[in-house]
């Protein structure tokens, strides 16, 4: 009996030592970073910027693998099914990790169970912009104007349940106003019709509209983050007038559930150091993204909070899960 106990103890010790050695040696080969969107977009470009710096810090390449489709679900599912050894990661956004949980009846993954969060990397607010023909100069004037013209102002979005749509729905609810929603199949047509005056208002990604704001073709009213954005420091936050307002998009790195904590910690340090590096910060800001690195626990709590927040907004918007 004693001999059996001794053998078991030795075996357990060897397994533990092997796991520790493996974590200490990590990474011993290239890491794959799955981006669940097509190459060339903001998610892809920012993911590549962070991946390159992480690779330098880790001493092994971090190679981006684009797995686009199904609103990010294909790529997210690939990460969830991968071996939990730290060599397959996902660069996921608020869509696949939070919004999708309310927009789809079934998903091939569960955001809170199938991933080990590594780090939140960036956040990005939208900016509420109006066509110059709308006779307002600030948010209070806009709210008053909308109340006097209920349903007469059209706002465009990239589709029902999209971040711009949910941003508008929360604004309508807190401000007590009503606008007419014009959903498009993509953001490009929204900007085209907004600039021509066919629609009068939108909640747009900052990077897309800054040139038009600077040219006087659009008026920036407020940003959707809880506080002012460093990208548009002179533009107030909606929350300054409507307390409690906040709708942002964000990105982060996740690993498959069950990835060893030591490996997650190693990846977190590399990602945080990468995002905080001056050259990466500059590149991210140029993309309209604000660096916001976190710990793994902070990112997990944030994901859970965002799932709840988006669920309320989707219900408020009356969008039915597909």
Show the residue positions of the predicted features.
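Sec/Tat signal peptide C-region and signal peptidase I cleavage site
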Residues: 17-23
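A ligand-binding cleft/hinge motif common to bilobed small-molecule-binding domains
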Residues: 96-106, 165, 170-174, 201-234
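An extracytoplasmic/periplasmic, membrane-proximal ligand-sensing/linker region
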Residues: 28-30, 173-174, 214, 237, ...
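N-terminal (or domain-start) structured segment
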Residues: 23-113, 152-154, 176-201, 293-294, ...
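Hinge/capping helix and adjacent helix->loop/strand transition within the periplasmic-binding protein
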Residues: 54, 81-87, 102-189, 238, ...
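Beta->alpha turn/N-cap motifs
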Residues: 90-96, 100, 157, 187, ...
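Bacterial N-terminal signal peptides that target proteins for export
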Residues: 1-10
């Amino acid at each position: 009996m004693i001999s059996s106990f001794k053998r078991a103890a030795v075996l357990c010790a060897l397994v533990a030592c092997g796991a520790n050695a493996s974590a200490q040696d990590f990474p011993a080969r290239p890491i794959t970073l799955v981006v669940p969107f097509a190459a060339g977009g903001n998610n892809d470009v920012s993911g590549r910027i962070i991946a390159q710096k992480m690779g330098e810090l880790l001493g092994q390449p971090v190679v981006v693998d684009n797995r686009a489709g199904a609103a990010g679900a294909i790529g997210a599912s690939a990460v969830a099914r991968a071996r939990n050894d730290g060599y397959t990661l996902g660069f996921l956004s608020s869509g696949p990790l939070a919004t999708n949980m309310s927009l789809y009846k079934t998903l091939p993954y569960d955001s809170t169970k199938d991933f080990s969060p590594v780090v939140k990397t960036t956040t990005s607010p939208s900016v509420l912009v109006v066509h110059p023909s709308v006779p307002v100069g600030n948010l209070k004037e806009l709210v008053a104007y909308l109340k006097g013209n209920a349903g007469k102002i059209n706002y465009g979005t990239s589709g029902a349940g999209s971040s711009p749509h949910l941003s508008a729905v929360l604004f309508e609810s807190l401000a007590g106003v009503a606008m007419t929603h014009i959903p498009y199949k993509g953001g490009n047509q929204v900007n085209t019709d907004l600039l021509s005056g066919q629609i009068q208002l939108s909640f747009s990604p900052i990077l897309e509209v800054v040139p038009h704001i600077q040219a006087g073709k659009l008026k920036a009213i407020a940003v959707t983050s809880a506080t002012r954005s460093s990208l548009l420091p002179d533009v107030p936050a909606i929350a300054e007038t409507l307390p409690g307002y906040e709708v942002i998009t964000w990105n982060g790195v996740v690993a498959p559930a069950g990835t060893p904590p030591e490996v997650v910690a190693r990846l977190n340090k590399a990602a945080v150091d990468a995002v905080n590096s001056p050259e990466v910060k500059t590149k991210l800001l140029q993309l309209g993204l604000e660096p916001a690195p976190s710990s793994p626990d902070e990112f997990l709590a944030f994901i859970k909070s965002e799932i709840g927040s988006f669920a309320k907004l989707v219900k408020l918007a009356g969008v039915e899960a597909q």
